[in-house]
């Protein structure tokens, strides 16, 4: 019962915060809010510089692989558990998923920087 109450409370609080975050910015929209700010001076150029979409995709891919590798960090402590077979199976599954996703990115040329 405590677990269900905790999950419900966390879900309700997260949903409430997301709704507030989407609702509040729509209350006051005016031109000064969307203009670039340069310490009170008139802007010398456009502050909306374009960036490479390839850079963005490589950065997102790096973050995903970094998160997956962070999941492997507790493995040395998990090796002291009673059920070593389950731990090794899950670790092998995670490493296989990491290797398969790296192979997929490589074959789809997602890691190539030149366009």
Curated annotation (Swiss-Prot):
Its EC number is 7.1.1.2. Its main location: mitochondrion. It is a multi-pass membrane protein. Coiled coil: none annotated. The keyword Membrane applies. It is found in: Mitochondrion inner membrane. InterPro entries: NADH_UbQ/plastoQ_OxRdtase_su3 (IPR000440), NDAH_ubi_oxred_su3_sf (IPR038430). The chain crosses the membrane at residues 4-24, 55-75, 84-104. GO terms for biological process: mitochondrial electron transport, NADH to ubiquinone. Keywords: Electron transport, Membrane, Mitochondrion, Mitochondrion inner membrane, NAD, Respiratory chain, Translocase, Transmembrane, Transmembrane helix, Transport, Ubiquinone. It catalyses: a ubiquinone + NADH + 5 H(+)(in) = a ubiquinol + NAD(+) + 4 H(+)(out). GO terms for cellular component: mitochondrial inner membrane; NADH dehydrogenase complex. The keyword NAD applies. It is an enzyme of class 7 (translocase). Core subunit of respiratory chain NADH dehydrogenase (Complex I) which is composed of 45 different subunits. Interacts with TMEM186. Interacts with TMEM242. Belongs to the complex I subunit 3 family. This is NADH-ubiquinone oxidoreductase chain 3. It comes from Halichoerus grypus (Gray seal).
């Amino acid at each position: 019962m405590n677990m269900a109450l905790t999950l419900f409370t966390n879900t309700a609080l997260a949903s409430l915060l997301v709704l507030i975050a989407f609702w509040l910015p729509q209350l006051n929209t005016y031109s000064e809010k969307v203009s670039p700010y340069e310490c009170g001076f008139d802007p010398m150029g456009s502050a909306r510089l374009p960036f490479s979409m390839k850079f963005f995709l490589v950065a997102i891919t790096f973050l995903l692989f970094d998160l997956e590798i962070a999941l492997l960090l507790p493995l040395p402590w998990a090796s002291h558990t009673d059920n070593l077979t389950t731990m090794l199976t899950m670790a092998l599954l995670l490493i296989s998923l990491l290797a398969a996703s790296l192979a997929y990115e490589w074959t789809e040329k997602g890691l190539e920087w030149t366009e």
